[in-house]
């Protein structure tokens, strides 16, 4: 039985209001030129590609929006339940007979950090969103499934949202099943610092975790830029520093230039403290 795959693709930094969709199984694109989630769509420019009239399956022959840079150091994570990888989550939203997908990271007892443009794929109903922490592939979800309960968008322009999820069928909270990630206070984050972006890119087999390795190239306000490659589906991926602390949430990129995340500065940290009682910021 064929499935349709939708994914979010593009949001230009010059016009933060425009978000484009790409197909979910393979496209998780980033912001500035591309939004790197597989979810949601408001940009009509890509609708003819991703509309429900198209039956899109994962395939090496399909094209998808991406920001692949000269540094394309990406590798699959197989030990997804070990260390800081445990909190990295695959996000899935059924839509138009197919689905959209993105990435996120567990940061509290019930809370996931991801992008606004990812959760917007649920069309206002958080229960349409399912979260699979530590997913290995589409047939192996070692830490099960959690369903969205509430969406809390960041009040500023930055592409950041908290997704609060309900306990699972065993009445366990997501933060009990996996260890929530630690947030960096970012007091020591610097240009040329080594970082990784870990999530579920759409050009790889569905729901497989991949890590991109690179360096910080710019820090300003609520934006962090880096020289590593990402693809649609990476939207919402955590950006980790060398201590495996989250310093940003990936959202998009500019072709042939850089990829970007929401930088967790003092204002973002206060937003997290106000909405996540057990947030761990160090």
UniProtKB/Swiss-Prot annotation:
As for subcellular location, the record says:
Secreted
- The active site annotation covers 117 (charge relay system), 159 (charge relay system), 235 (charge relay system)
Propeptide cleavage-removed residue intervals: 28-66
Q: Which InterPro entries match?
A: Glutamyl_endopeptidase, Peptidase_S1_PA, Peptidase_S1_PA_chymotrypsin, Peptidase_S1B, Peptidase_S1B_tx, V8_ser_AS
Query: What biological-process GO terms show up in the record?
Result: proteolysis
Q: What is its EC number?
A: 3.4.21.19
Alphabetized UniProt keyword annotations: Hydrolase, Protease, Secreted, Serine protease, Signal, Virulence, Zymogen
Q: Which reaction does it catalyse?
A: Preferential cleavage: Glu-|-Xaa, Asp-|-Xaa
The Swiss-Prot or TrEMBL record describes its family as follows: Belongs to the peptidase S1B family.
The name of this protein is Glutamyl endopeptidase
Q: Tell me which species this is from.
A: Staphylococcus epidermidis (strain ATCC 35984 / DSM 28319 / BCRC 17069 / CCUG 31568 / BM 3577 / RP62A)
């Amino acid at each position: 039985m064929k499935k349709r795959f939708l994914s979010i693709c593009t949001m230009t930094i010059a016009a933060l209001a425009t978000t484009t969709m790409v197909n979910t199984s393979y496209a998780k694109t980033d912001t500035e030129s591309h939004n790197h989630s597989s979810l949601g769509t408001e940009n009509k420019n890509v609708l003819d590609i991703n509309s429900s009239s198209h039956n899109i399956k994962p395939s090496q022959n399909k094209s998808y929006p991406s920001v692949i840079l000269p540094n394309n150091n990406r590798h699959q994570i197989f030990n997804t339940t070990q260390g800081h990888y445990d909190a990295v989550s695959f996000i899935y939203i059924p839509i138009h007979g197919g689905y959209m997908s993105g990435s996120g990271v567990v940061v509290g007892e019930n809370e996931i950090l991801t992008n606004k443009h990812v959760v917007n794929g649920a069309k206002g109903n958080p229960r349409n969103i399912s979260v699979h922490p530590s997913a290995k592939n589409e047939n192996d979800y070692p830490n099960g499934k959690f369903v969205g309960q509430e969406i809390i968008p960041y009040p500023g322009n930055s592409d950041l949202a908290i997704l609060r999820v309900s306990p699972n069928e065993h009445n366990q909270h997501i933060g009990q099943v996996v260890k929530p990630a630690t947030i960096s206070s970012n007091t020591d984050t610097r240009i040329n610092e080594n970082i990784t972006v870990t999530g579920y890119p759409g050009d790889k087999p569905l729901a497989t975790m991949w890590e991109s390795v690179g360096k910080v190239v710019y820090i300003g306000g609520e934006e962090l830029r880096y020289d590593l490659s990402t693809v649609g589906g990476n939207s919402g991926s955590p950006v980790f520093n060398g201590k495996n602390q989250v310093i940003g949430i990936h959202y998009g990129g500019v072709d042939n230039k850089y990829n970007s995340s929401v930088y967790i500065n003092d204002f973002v940290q206060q937003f997290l403290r106000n909405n996540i009682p057990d947030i761990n910021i160090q």
